[in-house]
Structure formats: structure tokens, C-alpha cells
Amino acid sequence: MTQRLLRLSLAHYRKDSCTEESCHYFGTALHAKQAATLHAKHGTLQYYQVYSTQAARDALDAFRRSLGADWTIDQHDLTVELYIRDLQTLRNIAADPEFASFYHLEEPYLSRRHVVASLGWVEAYVEEGKVVNVTDEGSEYRPGFGEFVGSGGELEKALA
């Protein structure tokens, strides 16, 4: 059986006074080690920082136009992704006294306005360039959707 993971994403804007380079410096030089250590301590399985510069957004917009797609291009500068087994992991991180120090560190770099949070589960079908977790009969993820999201199901337990 292939296990589904929860993914929390937090999409941030830089402060107007913070350059793209300074935002990257904050994330990689000032924040990454402390955040990664804290998240690993509490059971986070993966922690990613996703950077989106104006050049990347412009390139995506050009690609979108070439497809004739009606996409909205996300304008956030830094998105943090955490992959976890359950919501209790996030509660444990938030209750750790070290977590409170993150706000002070972020203050010169990240805006607290318009942070977009998303929580859902992940089903992976390509890893390392190879098709995974799928057969001719479909997805290998079990239980099926109804049982997974239903009352008493794995999702309910993970969110408890």
C-alpha cells in the first residue's frame, strides 16, 4: 500500500524593501538550517523552499499565453512546503518555543499580509523520472477516495 502524505504550503510575498536576492539570502542563509532542524525534530518528512522571481513568473506567463491557457500566475515570492503524516506534527512544531523566534527573523524580509496557506494530500505518480504508484488498473493508493475521506477514514485521523 502506498501512503498518502499531507502537504502544507505557505506562500509569502517579500516586503517592498526586500530584493529577490535578499529574500533568497534570508531563506537559505538565515532560516533554512533553523527551520529544517525544527521541522525534522517534530517529524516533518520533507521541507522545501520554492522561490519564484519575476523572471520566472514572466516566463510562465509567456508559456501560458503560448498555450492559450486561462491561468492566473501566482505572484508570491517564496513558498514553503512541508510534507507530513498528520496535523499533529504541525501542532507540535507550533508549540515548540523555537518556532516563535521565526517571526522575528522573518520580519525584515517577508510580508505577513496575504500569506496563502493550503493543506491537502499528495499522491505521487512520477518520481526520479519514473512512473510510480500506478498500474493498468489505476492508482495503487489505498484505501480508495470514499474510504480515505469518509468518517473514521485515514484523512480524518490525520487531521485530528
Swiss-Prot record:
Keyword check for Oxidoreductase: yes
Annotated ranges, domain EthD: 24-100
InterPro entries reported for this sequence: EthD_dom
Induction: Expression is positively controlled by the cluster-specific regulator ATEG_00326.
GO MF entry, a single one: oxidoreductase activity
Family: Belongs to the tpcK family.
Protein name per UniProt: Putative oxygenase ATEG_00330
Organism this protein belongs to: Aspergillus terreus (strain NIH 2624 / FGSC A1156)
